[in-house]
Amino acid sequence: ESTLAGAVAHELIERHQKSVIFQQWASIVDRLFFNVIEDQEERNQYRRALEEVDLLIIDEVAANRAKLAESQSSFLGHLLRRRRNLSKSVILITNHAPDSLHRAIGDFSFEAIKAFNPVDIHLAGPSRRPHIGSYTG
């Protein structure tokens, strides 16, 4: 999933000079909720960049089948609504099916996704990641 999203991002950057941010959800949370970015103005600039970039790709949303904390769910919902109002595109990458994603991110965020007229693409098949030694797990 991430490789495909990366290819889309590369195409937009190379051929259409569009701005793209590709971030894991955990990294966004760390930067905004756990003071990885200590300066408030820098955090505000980062948040604005997430809102205004031409294409935002968020990888591993609600990873490990985890349910988002209320503050994270609220932030995601507001971020998606802001991007929708600005007519900015977003790609969410997750291992959740739509029903379990709804439970993991909550009503507010799920309704924000629906406002985009989303396309659910299920990708199946073996992992493309290389094996580690003789371990194939």
Regions found by a protein language model. Name each.
Residues 50-51, 113:
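A short, aliphatic-rich alpha-helical micro-motif
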Residues 24:
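Conserved Walker A/P-loop ATP-binding site and its immediately adjacent core
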Residues 56-57:
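Walker B beta-strand of ABC/ABC-like P-loop ATPase nucleotide-binding domains
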Residues 18, 52-53, 88:
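Short coil/turn segments at beta-strand junctions that form active-site/ligand-binding loops
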